[in-house]
């Protein structure tokens, strides 16, 4: 064997064999290790490529080594067959004996190779000198030994190639049947054909059509044949349910579906009962006795993630894991799930032990979004997708884990690409001159068509109803406009025309009671930009609009979540001011208060309203102002140097400021404050990255019940005050608890001692001759009388002199 492998082949033989080989001549044979277990996977890939190039005859085999040189020279043995595909592609045979030896090593049959070398044609060592003398070399043989059994199927070996193999088709795969087509006569048939062709040619080239007729009219159904079965499938997917007019809605099916539906068994098979997977109480944290909230913390530059209970003194750790996520985490809108990011997809966790609830495979996922109802999850990956299988954006069903639909993503899009309605029944996306609105659970277009809106720039859903707002810029003499549309009827309930518009921003109040359109304008005859706040009162008839104009630069705008006030930061540093406005019931917008010389660039309202934090983040060194808007007083002014984030807890009782390692590499920590601006905690975490409060679902109490609780608040306040006194300090709380435990232990011991004392009473009576010494007056002789005298001094003081 070794001699056969070391024999060199003349250059002339290599040059003649070169056209027949597909491997480059510069490649060297692999070692035994590479030809053995390590070369199988590579060999499969390379041979699959060679099979694709070899043509439609994958069963052609190499001629046996026993053939003559003439037969070998004329045989098509250049390309390896699928049966010998396990041979490493880097092997370049230099002689028949060597080719057989290396080939047998790659297949893992060394004994068979030895038999081939010692066959009837002589050994490889004898064959090669004869070839050298004649100046020629035999072509290599790739044939298998007689006792070789190939137990690898073509599907396992060349599955990626065979899936693209042409398949036989009888032509009906490209035919669709369209029902509910208008029945027309010959005079209108041509017009109907034009309409049908216009609708269905969007999905592919139509090569044939057939309109059955009866009594001089069409029968109401037609047959269309596409150039490709894929086009037919696309037509069924998108045109089924297409509404032609009020009386005709198309029903589209593949022609091959008739066989499928006609062969359905009449016997009903009872489906197997799926075992119920108990996930536990996914909202357990809402039953916490002290009504504490939870929050997640990522630190050590993302290597560790922890979940804490929020406690006034010190946070209480619930769960901590290493490498729980690869980037960041996100809570679902109602706090049921915690989403973690991984290279291969998204995982959802929940329950008291934070077990994995669901996972979604999406390679390279970077962004996600939940529907407000927590029924659907949207994932985005920047990896390239194909026209036939869009994978950039995928919508998943959270309960089942199934993929609902995939979408393409334009490079210029901004996240979130899909925006959800308040109840999760609709979601929409904006493309060039188009607003596409989809409905759940079908994930199809509403009414099977998109809205054509020329020049649409932005849109936003109302948080309190299925109303969508969008704006369109000016086009020559046509003014810009803001439109409010009711869905699913698509009725325009309000249109507002605007002039000299530069830009618009849409701001909804949390309950959907108001919409503010921030309009940047350049009025004629003036220099600079003027900002108008167009306030739409959504709960009133015909949606009246009020306007507030400001000529200063606008830094930030924010609505009070549960109220009718809004705040505006305006001006330029160092003269930045904040103004608070109130929208009255009569429509008048009143300026409540304006604070000058503020170091702030962001507004953070409490989730319950009334209280607001004005923060100067990042470049403004973390200046903080805590304001009570009920009387517009500044409760406290503080600073968290280089603060990058501010997060209110869901109840509005606490607020967290933090310095993230993602934005600033030193002094990474998060501080806990009360809503009044009193600092409670300073929590320093190594390379702290992110803190997120766990959201709470909407309350189940009615407005009347909430009013009653507020009315009886004094009754509950005594209990709360007592708890507050006990928890004023950690030391006092521990001391009281220790004393309470000692007192309870003493009471139990005293009770046990009294019971034992009473059990021993009869024994005491016997020992004392029947005298009950338990009573003090049981023996009068034992009494001793003692008299105690107290000396009293009497002093008389006259009240006045006697005359």
UniProtKB/Swiss-Prot annotation:
HAMAP family found in the cross-reference section: eIF3b
PROSITE patterns linked to this entry: RRM
Deletion: any effect? Embryonic death.
Can you say what this protein is called? Eukaryotic translation initiation factor 3 subunit B
**Which family does the similarity line name?**
Belongs to the eIF-3 subunit B family.
As stated in the Swiss-Prot or TrEMBL entry, residues carrying the post-translational modification N-acetylmethionine are 1
Molecular-function GO terms, alphabetical: RNA binding; translation initiation factor activity; translation initiation factor binding
Assigned keywords, A-Z? Acetylation, Cytoplasm, Initiation factor, Phosphoprotein, Protein biosynthesis, Repeat, RNA-binding, WD repeat
Where found in the cell? Cytoplasm; Cytoplasm, Stress granule
Q: Where is this region: Sufficient for interaction with EIF3E?
A: 113-402
Which tissues does the record link to its expression?
Ubiquitously expressed.
Q: Where is this region: Sufficient for interaction with EIF3J?
A: 159-263
Role this protein plays: RNA-binding component of the eukaryotic translation initiation factor 3 (eIF-3) complex, which is required for several steps in the initiation of protein synthesis. The eIF-3 complex associates with the 40S ribosome and facilitates the recruitment of eIF-1, eIF-1A, eIF-2:GTP:methionyl-tRNAi and eIF-5 to form the 43S pre-initiation complex (43S PIC). The eIF-3 complex stimulates mRNA recruitment to the 43S PIC and scanning of the mRNA for AUG recognition.
- Claim: RNA-binding is one of the keywords in the record: yes
Its domain of life reads: Eukaryota
WD repeat copies, ranges: 321-359, 361-406, 410-448, 549-590, 638-683
Chief site of localization: cytoplasm
Q: Which residues carry this modification: Phosphoserine?
A: 37, 40, 68, 75, 79, 84, 88, 90, 111, 120, 123, 141, 143, 153, 228
Which Gene Ontology BP terms does the record give? formation of cytoplasmic translation initiation complex; IRES-dependent viral translational initiation; regulation of translational initiation; translational initiation; viral translational termination-reinitiation
Which residue numbers delimit the RRM domain?
174-257
Q: How is it modified after translation?
A: Phosphorylated. Phosphorylation is enhanced upon serum stimulation.
Question: In which residue ranges is the amino acid composition biased (Polar residues)?
Answer: 73-93
Which segments show compositional bias classed as Low complexity?
Answer: 1-11
What is said about the domains?
The RRM domain mediates interaction with EIF3J.
Acidic residues compositional bias, start-end: 44-56, 135-147
**What is the originating organism of this protein?**
Mus musculus (Mouse)
